Each structure stands twice: as C-alpha cells, then as structure tokens.
C-alpha cells in the first residue's frame, strides 16, 4: 500500500510502498479517507532532537485521521464493516494502575500511533478496536480527521469550569484557536488569545475569540482594561510552550485562578513561584485526551453548534503531501488535510 514514511534519519518524508498491516484478533483495519498534519509531524519532518530520540526508522507516520472499517479481528464486538471511524492515537497497556482505574489517558506505558508504531499516513491502518471511535453521519470527514487535536483542545479547555469566566489562551496554533472556540461555546465571558502570528490570530477572531492580541504590538494589560477586567483572568490555557508567554499568563491570572498546560516549554524553564504560591494558583498538566469522555464531548459540541470549519485552511491530495507540509511550515495555515481517496 501507499504510505508516507520516514525512511532515513534526516529531514523530510517519502511517499513509498509498504506492506498492508496485519489485523490481530482484537484489531480493526481502517481504510483511510483523510489525514491531517500535526505539529508532531512537523517535528518528524524537520528531524529535530525530539524526533531523533523518538521515531523508529524506517516507519510510516501520522496520527490524525478518519476512515472506514474494512476488516475486523474475530474478537471484535461493537463495530461493523463500513463503520466510519477516527481513533484514539494513544494505545494504552490496560494493566497499569491508571488503566485499571479507568484513567487510560494517564497510562505510563502509552504507545503512540505514528510515533512509536506505524501510523495513519497510509491507505490502511490497523489499531485495537478499543481505540476506534464511531463518527456520526452529520460530521464531515474533514472535521473527523482533526479529532485528535480537537481532543487536545477539548481536554485542556474543559479541565475547569468556564461558564461566566474570563479565559486567557497563550498560543494561537490550531489547538489554541480551537480552544478559544470551545471556551466561547460553553459559556466563557471574555476569551483572550495571544500570539505574534497575525494569520493565526485572525483565525482566532473568526472562531469567536473576544480579543486576539499580537503581544509584539499590544499590551495584554491594555486589553484587560478595555474589557473592564479589574481582577485578572480566572482560567489560563497555555498552548504555546513559550516561557515568556507562560510568565505573562501567571502575571495576568486572578488570585485563585486555574491554569492548564498543554504547551511544552524547554525542560529548564524558570517561573516566578511567587505568582503561583501567593495567588493560590492551581496548575494542571494536560496530555492527550480522556478516553473516551473527551471524544463524546467533542461530538456533543459539534452537534450543538460548535463551528470548527474555519480552522481547516488547506486541502491536498496525499500525493501532494509536500505542498501540505510547506503550508504548515509557512506559519500561515490552520489545519492541513491530506485526501487519501484521490
């Protein structure tokens, strides 16, 4: 089958032919319709330090996808041939303490599709049936293909009660922008998002952010004054991994505020602990999606009117993957979709 793979230890990916995956007794085989390019895939493309330490070579990659089930293992129940599915990209062990307690998103033995094992940038993908998630007919293939990052945004944004709250989001990448849309959808009062990329800040405005702030030109304090905020933000969602952004967030938080961290800062990042301790801030690290509560909430929000369509800005045939990666690397894109059916 056709697949997009890392064949050599260096930058780039190659469209090649690989063996169609085998289907175990508890697996489903998915014929891929659409995939989306993730920031993780950009790290793999660039072959940065993280990728060099993490990605097996050779291996085909990718973990954001939608397709249909074309084959099932003999032990699979609850699915049928022809079901349209996406899937949880974190394959968990099932036997550690957290898995046995129903907290699979905290599994210490997690294996990532397209990161530690063969991925979805291919015509077919085999995964455990447990990880597959049926997509309702009213949700398009394009939207279903971005459920993985949409899930990151949902898990982060819904970590705390947002109803009537003032929310600060640092980082207007696709996940940050989707988090802004989610926050408004569920009842936040003011949703302010910061970045230095005007293209992505404009996407955030289209998705419903109250204010999209280019912090290279505009003061966050001035924006807070314009919004008549006198006490600081109630909830912070850190999506950038940029130390200066996190510092600004801590300074802007109200006493008793809550902060969720999805962005990954450098390992030795220093912060002002006085801001955390004397303000009584609650800080929570976010990884992946809650299985599968996050997935049900994603579907429910789309079915109740959440519009994520502006975040999908580019579409290409899978054979034109280089154009898709170029769009992502340009910094002037939202989500980029690759079509494996043409």
Curated annotation (Swiss-Prot):
NAD(+) binds at residues 175, 195, 200, 262-264, 286-287. Its EC number is 1.1.1.103. The active site is at residues 40, 43. The record marks 148 as: Important for catalytic activity for the proton relay mechanism but does not participate directly in the coordination of zinc atom. The keyword Metal-binding applies. SMART domains: PKS_ER. It is found in: Cytoplasm. Its cofactor is Zn(2+). It catalyses: L-threonine + NAD(+) = (2S)-2-amino-3-oxobutanoate + NADH + H(+). It comes from the Bacteria. PROSITE patterns: ADH_ZINC (PS00059). Zn(2+) 1 binds at residues 38, 63-64. SUPFAM superfamilies: GroES-like (SSF50129), NAD(P)-binding Rossmann-fold domains (SSF51735). Zn(2+) 2 binds at residues 93, 96, 99, 107. Belongs to the zinc-containing alcohol dehydrogenase family. Homotetramer. Catalyzes the NAD(+)-dependent oxidation of L-threonine to 2-amino-3-ketobutyrate. This is L-threonine 3-dehydrogenase.
């Amino acid at each position: 089958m056709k697949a997009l793979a890392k064949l050599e230890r260096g930058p780039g990916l190659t469209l090649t032919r690989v063996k169609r995956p085998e289907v175990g007794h508890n697996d489903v085989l998915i014929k891929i319709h659409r995939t989306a390019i993730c920031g993780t895939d950009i790290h793999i493309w660039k072959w940065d330090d993280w990728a060099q330490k993490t990605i097996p070579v050779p291996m085909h990659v990718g973990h954001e996808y939608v397709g249909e089930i074309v084959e099932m293992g003999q032990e699979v129940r609850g699915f049928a041939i022809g079901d349209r599915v996406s899937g949880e990209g974190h394959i968990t062990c099932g036997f550690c303490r957290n898995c046995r307690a129903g907290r699979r998103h905290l599994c210490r033995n997690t294996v990532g599709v397209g990161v530690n094992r063969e991925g979805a940038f291919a015509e077919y993908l085999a995964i455990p049936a447990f990880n597959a998630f049926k997509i309702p007919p009213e949700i398009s293939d394009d939207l279903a293909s971005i459920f993985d990052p949409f899930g990151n945004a949902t898990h982060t944004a819904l970590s705390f009660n947002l109803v009537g709250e003032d929310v600060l989001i640092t980082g207007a990448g696709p996940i940050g922008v989707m988090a802004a849309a989610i926050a408004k959808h569920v009842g936040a009062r003011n949703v302010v998002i910061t970045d230095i990329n005007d293209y992505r800040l404009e996407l955030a405005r289209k998705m419903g952010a109250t204010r999209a702030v280019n912090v290279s030109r505009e003061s966050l304090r001035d924006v807070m004054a314009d919004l008549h905020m006198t006490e600081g933000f109630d909830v912070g969602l850190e999506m950038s991994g940029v130390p200066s952004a996190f510092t600004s967030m801590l300074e802007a938080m109200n006493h008793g505020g809550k902060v969720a961290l999805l962005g990954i800062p450098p390992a030795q990042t220093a912060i002002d602990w006085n801001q955390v301790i004397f303000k009584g801030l609650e800080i929570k690290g976010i990884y992946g999606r809650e299985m599968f509560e996050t997935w049900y909430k994603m579907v429910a929000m789309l079915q109740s009117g959440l519009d994520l369509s502006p975040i999908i800005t580019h579409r290409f045939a899978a054979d034109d993957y280089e154009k898709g990666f170029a769009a992502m690397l340009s910094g002037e894109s939202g989500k980029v979709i690759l079509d494996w059916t043409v």
